[in-house]
C-alpha cells in the first residue's frame, strides 16, 4: 500500500482513515473534484464575455497554486522555482538558444527532484508526489520555449505545418506564463496543452470562425455559438467512476507482482502465465484512465478542449484528451497502442525531440521519455525494450501486412492474431514500469527466458528492411504543405483545428500528422 504520509494538508485525514486510502491520494482526488466545481464556476461567472483575460489569468493561477499548496505543502514552491528560473532564461538568453537552455534546465531540475524523492523519501511508493505536476510543467516549459523559438527566430519556410500553427510570435507576460504553467485545471494531472490553445481559451477566441481573405490573411467572419460541454463532462465522469471502481475492486486481486511469484512461476503453465500477464496489466490501467479522464473533464467543464464538430454535428471535446480507451484495448499494433496512450506526452516528445533531432530520433525519443518519467530502473528497462519492440513490430508490419489485406476473412484473422501479439508484447514490455526496481524486473524477464527480446532481435536481423516512401518524401511533403498554407494564409493564429474548417476529414488529417512521426 502507498505511504500514508503527506507533505500537504492533513485536513482530510479522517476521510482517509474512513475510506482506508492514503492521505496523499485522498487529497489528490478531493482537490480534483474541487477543481471540477471551480471549473464550472469559472465558465459560468468568469466567462470571457463577462470579465477580462487578466482576471481569468489571475484567478486560474491563484486557484492552481492553492491546490498545489494543499496537496504538497511547501514542496509546491518547486513549481514556482522551476517556472521562474525558466522564464528568466527565456528573457536573458534570447530566442536563438533559449529552447536548448530551458530544455536542459527544466529537465535537469525535474530529474534532481525525482532523485531526491525516490532515493531519499519514499522509494517504490505510488503516491501523489510533487514531481508529478513538475513533469507536466516541464512539458509546458520546454514546449513553450520551442514554440517561441519557432515563432520569433526561425523562418516560416523552415517550419513544419504543425510548428507554424503552434509558433508563438511574442514573449508571454509573466502572468500569462504562470497561468499557463500553474492553472487550476491542469496543475495536478495536466494534461499538456499548447500555449496558443490555452491563450485562445482564456481570451475567448476558441469559437471564432476564420477564413482566408482576398489579401491572403485570415479574417474573422463571425463567432460560432458556444456549445455546452455538459454532455462530454458527464460521460467522462462516468468513465472515471467505472475506472475507479474497477481499480479499487479488481486491481488489488490481480497484482502485477504475482507474475514473479516463485510458486506461480514454478507451477503455472505457459498459457496460464500469458493470460495472467495480460489480465494483471489490464487491471493496472484503470487508475490512469481515472486520473487522465478526470483531468480532461475538468478542462472541459471550464470550457477548454473544444475541437469542432463531427460529421453528425456533435461537439467534440477532445482537443487535449490524453487517451482513447477503446482504441487502447483493441490495439492490433504497437503503434496503435502508443498512438492512443498518453497522447499529449506523445505529442510533446514528437515536437521537442523527434522533429528536432537528425540522429536516431526513435531511440532518442524513448530515452527522453524514460528520463522524463523518472529515475526508477524499471522505466529504462521498459523504454529500451519499447525501442526494440517498436522497431521489430514495424519490420513485421512492413514485410507481412500486405499479404493479409484481402479477402476480408483473412484480414479478420490477421487482426485477431495481431491483437493477441500486441497485447502480450505491450504487457511484457511494461512490467518493469510497474515493478520499478531492477531485480524483480530481471526476474520476470528471466522467467520468460527473454523470449520477446530474442524474437525482436531475430526479426531485425533476419527480415529485410523495407524503406517506405513516407520517410523519403517527408521533407518534400512538408515543403509543399508549408508553401500551400503560407500562400493561402491558413491558420496564422495557430488556433485549434476547428478554427479553419468544420470538415472532419481535415481534422483527422491534422490529428494524424501530429501523431504519426513519433509512432511510425
Swiss-Prot record:
EC assignment: 2.3.1.-, 2.3.1.51, 2.3.1.23, 2.3.1.n7
Pfam families according to UniProt: MBOAT
Recorded GO MF terms: 1-acylglycerol-3-phosphate O-acyltransferase activity; 1-acylglycerophosphocholine O-acyltransferase activity; 1-acylglycerophosphoethanolamine O-acyltransferase activity; 1-acylglycerophosphoserine O-acyltransferase activity; 2-acylglycerol-3-phosphate O-acyltransferase activity; acyltransferase activity
GO biological process entries: lipid modification; phosphatidylcholine acyl-chain remodeling; phosphatidylethanolamine acyl-chain remodeling; phosphatidylserine acyl-chain remodeling; phospholipid biosynthetic process; regulation of chondrocyte differentiation
Keyword annotations: Acyltransferase, Endoplasmic reticulum, Lipid biosynthesis, Lipid metabolism, Membrane, Phospholipid biosynthesis, Phospholipid metabolism, Transferase, Transmembrane, Transmembrane helix
Membrane topology category: Multi-pass membrane protein
Tissue localization of expression: Expressed in neutrophils.
Chief location bin: endoplasmic reticulum
Residues the record marks as active site: 342, 373
Top-rank lineage group of the source organism: Eukaryota
InterPro entries cross-referenced by the UniProt entry: LPLAT_7/PORCN-like (IPR049941), MBOAT_fam (IPR004299)
Pathway terms, separated by semicolons: Lipid metabolism; phospholipid metabolism
Regulation: Partially inhibited by thimerosal.
TM regions (residue ranges): 22-42, 61-81, 88-108, 184-204, 237-257, 264-284, 366-386, 416-436, 444-464
Described purpose of this protein according to its UniProt entry: Acyltransferase which catalyzes the transfer of an acyl group from an acyl-CoA to a lysophospholipid leading to the production of a phospholipid and participates in the reacylation step of the phospholipid remodeling pathway also known as the Lands cycle. Catalyzes preferentially the acylation of lysophosphatidylethanolamine (1-acyl-sn-glycero-3-phosphoethanolamine or LPE) and lysophosphatidic acid (LPA) and to a lesser extend lysophosphatidylcholine (LPC) and lysophosphatidylserine (LPS). Prefers oleoyl-CoA as the acyl donor. May be involved in chondrocyte differentiation.
Record protein name field: Membrane-bound glycerophospholipid O-acyltransferase 2
Species annotation: Homo sapiens (Human)
